[in-house]
């Protein structure tokens, strides 16, 4: 599969995860209301229909009702003309707005949401191989993460839940594959090894997924 296509699909999955996560944050276990929240909640006019929403609802509204218009408009927060992606601009340039009325106590639930979204984005057989590469990439960076206790406390629970969930979801598939492989003759070692090009593509895909996970973890930890 073309690497650009993988990148587009993963970027789309990441954005859907972030919007889904933010829009349902009130229902996540471990969230606590900050005293006087209603006093700080501001509403902004949608740049495409002039209806008013709080910052999270605005992003969800634009994504659902104005997906085509979102590539060109004026940011309702800073009044800057955006010519690429309005939602990406708001979530990246005004990330602090999402944290004004909330403080985070737990990361529980985030990994499961990301997992389900990626499963929908990759319904074919490529999902499992993608995470095999991601697991190796995360392992290779575990030493540097362990050096920072704060980062480790955020990343470790999410990573454990993420890959344990993936293992349980793929248990039946793995069992079936094992039975099938036992009935087949031994394959040539050369056929089992990936070509250099396949290896590079899988490595690129793994690094991209790791980058998405890391960026979301670091943004939530700020």
From Swiss-Prot:
Major subcellular location class: nucleus
InterPro entries: DI19 (IPR033347), Di19_C (IPR027935), Di19_Zn-bd (IPR008598)
One Pfam family per UniProt: Di19_C
Signal sequence coordinates: none
Tissue: Expressed in seedlings, roots, leaves, stems, flowers and siliques.
Cellular compartments annotated: Nucleus
Expression induction: Not induced by abscisic acid.
GO cellular component assignments: nucleus
Post-translational modifications: Phosphorylated in vitro by CPK3 or CPK11.
Keywords: Nucleus, Phosphoprotein
Chain positions with Phosphoserine modification: 116
PANTHER family reported for this sequence: PROTEIN DEHYDRATION-INDUCED 19 (PTHR31875), PROTEIN DEHYDRATION-INDUCED 19-RELATED (PTHR31875:SF26)
Family under the similarity heading: Belongs to the Di19 family.
Protein's UniProt name: Protein DEHYDRATION-INDUCED 19 homolog 6
